[in-house]
Amino acid sequence: MPDMNDYHGEFKPDFKFADLSKEALVKLIETYQRIFQGLCVVSVQVAQEQRGKDAGQQQFNEIYARTMTRFAIPLIRQALDIHDDDVISMFKYFQVAPDGCRGGGMYDFDFAVTNSNDVSYTGKYCQNASFYEKHGDADGMNRLCAMGPGSFEHSAYEAICAAFNPNMKMEWPVLPPRADRSAPFCRWRFWIDERDRSGGPA
């Protein structure tokens, strides 16, 4: 039987993901990513409505961090055999995460790899940041990423870095708001000092 490009035909009681074509699987995975993003958006909205903006944001940040460290990171690392603790391995995870940077047109990133333990990315497009920019929502942008420490993105990256390597460091030389619409939304760098890997003096 040929691979299924869609599921508009008859119901298959013995359906398996392996029955789908590569194109259909990619489309389904990207749809799952959008569903995960939607779950995150609704979760933070409900938390803020019920607990207030600050407490709700803090609660959601903690829920997301625990979900990544308890489920997403270990399960994806196991599924794709990503076992190293260097920065480039974390970027491999970023590419295939439930809200990953390669799927469905949600993000457009450029990567700069100095070595396996020094990697930067430039965010040319971000669906969430673009939404806040379009609606002039400075508070939403700050809570997402623009205020740096305390924002959702900063909290998430702290948790993900720690899950891969407690010695990993990060900096964020560019954050919103953008000077103009042709500028990147953000730029982040992640690295591990060689002395930290070798156990040498700081």
Map each language-model feature to its residues.
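N-terminal accessory segment detector
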Residues: 1-120, 125-152, 156-158, 162-185, ...
